[in-house]
Amino acid sequence: VGPRSDKKWASGASEKLYKNLKHALEEDSVNLPRLECKYANARVLSCGGTGAQWLAQAPTCHLTQIPDDDMRTVIRFRLGKETFCADVCPHINADGVPCGKQCDREGRHLLSCPSGGGFFVGHDSVCATYCALAAGADGIPGAQAAWKPRVDAWPRSTRGAEADAGFFRLPGSRDTYVDAVCSYANPVTYRGCDSTAGTVAEWKARKKNAEHPVFDAQNHRRLHPFDFRALSFERHGYWAKETVGFTKKLAFARASVLGLDPAAEICRWYGIIS
């Protein structure tokens, strides 16, 4: 698949994916319980947008290559098919205590289990990918990244109060700290995610910004010389608008410095991260 306009592809793919899956969903869900229909609607809405870019790009480069077995699992996951064959959750928390809860075949519990090792692996993998794309050997010339930096402006009152990564010496930008969150759009937990795409991703992004203030809430004056951006994703693929904008900004910076086609570079970043 050749380079495409990032906005045109993302919106077009999202619309087609939503229409096709919703039509199939309506046919399959006639006899489903109401809650199962809500789960299915939330999943379909969460699959589209920029987060679907990987469908058009795997495997156009080594960073988008996916083993066949993993590809099958990913497709099954996004189609709402069974992806987990065990009965009991295998997760163990940081204190060594196993979860032990009963698991559903669709993996819903695994996606939201607070003790999940896979939960943190996925989160850290996304952050590491951003660091590599922006400041790795083939990243933005001159850019630097810091992993889990301490930021005195945001004391660590909870595990997630400080930043996951910091990006420095970005062309035309302030130093920027980011904090990531990968959430499961569960209609039982998040009201409205079965009727509006991106409900969970956008809510989590707002929450991250509230935890990492850069401007005074009363007079809106800048408090710090740096910026903050939330990297907020839904597990089925949807990205918060703020996350899309920051990713596009980084990709455009690299394209500008290296004389690349901005649209193709933005698509490349979307595909690798998604």
PLM-predicted stretches and their roles:
Residues V1-K81:
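Acidic catalytic cores of enzymes that act on phosphate-bearing nucleotides/polynucleotides
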Residues T64-R105, T129-G192, A201-R206, A210-E211:
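Active-site metal-binding core of divalent-cation-utilizing nuclease and nuclease-like domains
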Residues V1-E26, A132, R169-L170, A251-S256, ...:
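Class I S-adenosyl-L-methionine
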Residues A94-V126:
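Short Cys/His-based metal-binding microdomains
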Residues D6, A10, T60, T64, ...:
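Generic alpha-helical structural element
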Residues W154, T158-A163, P171-T176, A180-S274:
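Catalytic cores of nucleic-acid endonucleases
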Residues G12, K16, F84, V121, ...:
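Generic recognition of stable, solvent-exposed alpha-helical segments in well-folded globular domains
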